[in-house]
């Protein structure tokens, strides 16, 4: 890919799991964070240092099973997901419908 980019999660809305696809223009240390509607971080997913490429398919995209870092199932509502890859940061919205 020519640019690093955070793509729309799928499915959206979802219940209880979703995948968060992204593209990396260069090798980067990647972290994904999930926030609730109030802006509180509820989950962090550290992917470590990964090579440039497309992480779009189910077996490559970031997986989130709808649980907090403490393992609690989250309730229906709007959440935000953010990816940090080197100097790149992007945030998008997703919805859980139960």
At which residue positions do the language-model features occur?
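Conserved beta-strand and immediately adjacent loop positions that scaffold enzyme active sites
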Residues: 31, 63, 93
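Residue-level signal for short segments within beta-strands and strand-turn junctions
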Residues: 34-38, 68, 85, 96-98
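Short beta-strand edge segments in extracellular beta-sheet folds
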Residues: 48-49, 94-98
């Amino acid at each position: 890919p020519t640019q690093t980019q955070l793509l729309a999660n799928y499915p959206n809305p979802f219940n209880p799991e979703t995948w968060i696809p992204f593209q990396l223009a260069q090798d980067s240390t990647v972290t994904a964070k999930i926030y609730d509607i109030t802006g509180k971080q509820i989950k962090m997913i550290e992917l470590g240092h990964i090579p440039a490429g497309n992480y779009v398919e189910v077996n490559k995209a970031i997986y989130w099973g709808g649980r907090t870092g403490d393992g609690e199932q989250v309730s229906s509502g709007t959440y935000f997901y953010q990816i940090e890859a080197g100097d790149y940061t992007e945030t998008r919205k997703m919805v859980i419908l139960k």
